[in-house]
């Protein structure tokens, strides 16, 4: 059975060119880039080339890029560095819909005496800039938000957030793990101070990422030891991963033109599902959204049941973040949006890539209506019960 992979916000297929670029650094050019001999030196040059490729994709300088192991490390490093640089400030602002790699760090910091403001979002997943303005104080060290939500694809007004953070004297960090390679970036003209990315979300292997640190932003390293990454991230370099990320960044720049094609396929999927299946709606902002992502709610059934049914046909989708998919709780993102109980528990995410085909989308459109019809036929919730649940959603959630 062939696989139709529509879970690209969880991870992506490694591009064949990326694999070809990294393999020689596992078998042939395996020297340590910190070594003084020529064998290690040529590896060091390749690492610098990869750094330049990542910088070019971001519209940044090579010196502003450090390699990390993943998005989680980058987020931890950015948040803790911002606080270490401003020990007199004890306030952080983030949002209620962040990835666990941000929210759980903030919860840990609250236990250490920091005050954290979690900005709310509206029913379309957008923040209120007036709420941000009201939250900013002279004690605010950091504003940390995602660029685009991993579950709904909703894109935040990043530059407007950044300008407000700057006016308040706060450092602005952006978790752009879902956005890099999907939206054009030019950090030279941006208000972003630090930005996190992860290789496995843009067709590089798992275990490699990068952190952008604007020139002049004070940074205390999370990992201390050797002199690697100009003293900003200790540890022997993951050279094959760095080469892979560099090549993936180069290809991502080229494939930014595919965004229109991805959006057309995404829209075809959405429109087909909405027209064929009643009591169905798209979760998130109608326009300010990643071109590859759709989060759709099907009333009166459980999202997990839909995913299991799709899995029988080799179709891979998700009910939310892969980092929390083992939890039986409903999505914290959709809860924050205030969605009704019936949509909250019946929502799934499809996330496309440059490899997604029209035939794959049509296959999903063929299979979804009978799957939903069958699940609704055996669902314990009638329309009347569902209406009752909507009025009781808060009680049931607890």
Curated annotation (Swiss-Prot):
Its EC number is 2.8.1.7. Keywords: Iron, Iron-sulfur, Metal-binding, Nitrogen fixation, Pyridoxal phosphate, Transferase. [2Fe-2S] cluster binds at residue 323. It is an enzyme of class 2 (transferase). The active site is at residue 323. GO terms for molecular function: cysteine desulfurase activity; iron-sulfur cluster binding; metal ion binding; pyridoxal phosphate binding. GO terms for biological process: amino acid metabolic process; nitrogen fixation. SUPFAM superfamilies: PLP-dependent transferases. It catalyses: (sulfur carrier)-H + L-cysteine = (sulfur carrier)-SH + L-alanine. Belongs to NIF2 gene cluster which is expressed in vegetative cells and heterocysts under anaerobic conditions only. This second system appears to serve as an auxiliary system that does not suppress expression of the first system. Homodimer. Belongs to the class-V pyridoxal-phosphate-dependent aminotransferase family. NifS/IscS subfamily. Catalyzes the removal of elemental sulfur atoms from cysteine to produce alanine. Seems to participate in the biosynthesis of the nitrogenase metalloclusters by providing the inorganic sulfur required for the Fe-S core formation. This is Cysteine desulfurase 2.
